[in-house]
Amino acid sequence: MINFNNVKIFSGNSNLELAKKIAEKAGLQLGKAEIQRFKDGEVYIEIEETVRGRDVFVVQSTSEPVNENLMELLIFVDALKRASAKTINVIIPYYGYARQDRKSKPREPITSKLVANLLTTAGVNRVVAMDLHADQIQGFFDIPLDHMQALPLMARYFKEKGFKGDEVVVVSPDVGGVKRARKLAEKLDCKIAIIDKRRPKPNMSEVMNLIGEVEGKIAIFIDDMIDTAGTITNGADAIAQRGAKEVYACCTHAVFSDPAIERLEKSVLKEIVITDSIALPERKKIDKIKILSVDSVFANAIDRITNNQSVSELFN
């Protein structure tokens, strides 16, 4: 049970609807804050209620426009720190810059680590994120980070559709996603398949080979994010050509950079299951897309954090 007198929750502009749902699930009122832009683009934030001595949560996905939303979050944290908040906990449903988690070429930055440093220096006491692109990002922080998962929601959704057992196969779009695919396959009591993908250029992918059996089965792709949708749609075509009965896809983060929607609309995919970790504009809400809300996941995390209980037990 959350101590409502000691806890406050606020939202930036990136995903206000999700923040409202999280607050409602947690039994909290969304805090009042004025967020404006000066004519030159600078961010101005004023907290319009007292936060002195309170445990404060701020909901903000660092999605497109990434730099705007990140800077807004940092300024929000600074305002809370200067207003004497007891603890500042940031809920980042989608953690931008997560794909820049290592040096693959000489003289490249590791921007995921830079963002972690910026958040910590700004005054964040705890980060609550969901399905980070790379697990090692958790180690970039010198403050507690709770890593939420959307996979149980997706498993429940597909189970309710009757998708389980030998008639289903979970497909990883690349070798790096095998661990994620195996977890979903365990929950659906089915086998996995793996696509061997070669990427000649950024945001371009080419399907080369398939490991596993898909003929006559319902195939479910799973990934942490879909960006331009080239990987998923090329993979879906390859699976369909090899005799899959139906092809579905699911991901936590619907980045959906152009031309993702066009590709998904034209693809053989029957349904794309996503979460609301990123606010999806109305123009991108096509009939094929099913949105699952992660509001209860973060509301439960708030409850456990404020009561000094284990957050990881939510996923055991």
From Swiss-Prot:
ATP binds at residues 40-42, 99-100. The keyword Nucleotide-binding applies. GO terms for molecular function: ATP binding; kinase activity; magnesium ion binding; ribose phosphate diphosphokinase activity. Binds 2 Mg(2+) ions per subunit. Its EC number is 2.7.6.1. InterPro entries: PRib_PP_synth_CS, Pribosyltran_N, PRibTrfase_dom, PRTase-like, Rib-P_diPkinase, Rib-P_diPkinase_bac. It holds the Pfam family Pribosyl_synth. Keywords: ATP-binding, Cytoplasm, Kinase, Magnesium, Metal-binding, Nucleotide biosynthesis, Nucleotide-binding, Transferase. Mg(2+) 1 binds at residue 133. Its main location: cytoplasm. One of its GO terms (cellular component) is ribose phosphate diphosphokinase complex. D-ribose 5-phosphate binds at residues 199, 223, 227-231. Mg(2+) 2 binds at residue 174. CDD domains: PRTases_typeI. This is Ribose-phosphate pyrophosphokinase. The lineage of its organism: Bacteria, Fusobacteriati, Fusobacteriota, Fusobacteriia, Fusobacteriales.
